[in-house]
Amino acid sequence: MATQTVEDSSKPRPKRTGAGSLLKPLNSEYGKVAPGWGTTPFMGVAMALFAIFLSIILEIYNSSILLDGILTN
């Protein structure tokens, strides 16, 4: 089986951009996970409130909830 060697100088280097330089610090924490539950309970509460909001919108759309003074087609 034939093998091919590639010199390091022949590899194209990624182009540095201003946006990349600004975003690099955000990626420096990649792979690090804080111990414990963190903000998981807050996310659970936010998801529950969003589900309630969506169900209210759906009930209004289906005319399950009638709103006085608001005309719907």
UniProtKB/Swiss-Prot annotation:
After translation, how is this protein modified?
Answer: Phosphorylation is a light-dependent reaction catalyzed by a membrane-bound kinase; phosphorylation occurs on Thr residue(s) in the N-terminus of the protein.
Q: Show the InterPro entries listed in the entry.
A: PSII_PsbH (IPR001056), PSII_PsbH_sf (IPR036863)
Gene3D superfamilies recorded for this chain? Photosystem II reaction center protein H
Q: Name one GO cellular component term.
A: photosystem II
Q: Which GO terms describe its biological process?
A: photosynthesis; protein stabilization
Which SUPFAM superfamilies does the entry link to?
Photosystem II 10 kDa phosphoprotein PsbH
Membrane-topology annotation of the record: Single-pass membrane protein
Q: Phosphothreonine (modified residue): where?
A: T3, T5
Q: Name one GO molecular function term.
A: phosphate ion binding
Q: Which residues cross the membrane?
A: 41-61
The answer, when asked if Oxidoreductase is one of the entry's keywords, is no
- Keywords attached to this entry: Chloroplast, Membrane, Phosphoprotein, Photosynthesis, Photosystem II, Plastid, Thylakoid, Transmembrane, Transmembrane helix
Where does the record place the region Disordered? 1-23
List localization entries: Plastid, Chloroplast thylakoid membrane
Which Pfam families does UniProt cross-reference here?
A: PsbH
Q: Function of this protein?
A: One of the components of the core complex of photosystem II (PSII), required for its stability and/or assembly. PSII is a light-driven water:plastoquinone oxidoreductase that uses light energy to abstract electrons from H(2)O, generating O(2) and a proton gradient subsequently used for ATP formation. It consists of a core antenna complex that captures photons, and an electron transfer chain that converts photonic excitation into a charge separation.
Family (UniProt):
Belongs to the PsbH family.
Task: Report quaternary structure and partners.
Answer: PSII is composed of 1 copy each of membrane proteins PsbA, PsbB, PsbC, PsbD, PsbE, PsbF, PsbH, PsbI, PsbJ, PsbK, PsbL, PsbM, PsbT, PsbX, PsbY, PsbZ, Psb30/Ycf12, at least 3 peripheral proteins of the oxygen-evolving complex and a large number of cofactors. It forms dimeric complexes. Detected in both etioplasts and green leaves; PSII is only assembled in green leaves.
Q: What is this protein called?
A: Photosystem II reaction center protein H
What's the source species for this entry? Hordeum vulgare (Barley)
Organism placement in taxonomy = Eukaryota, Viridiplantae, Streptophyta, Embryophyta, Tracheophyta
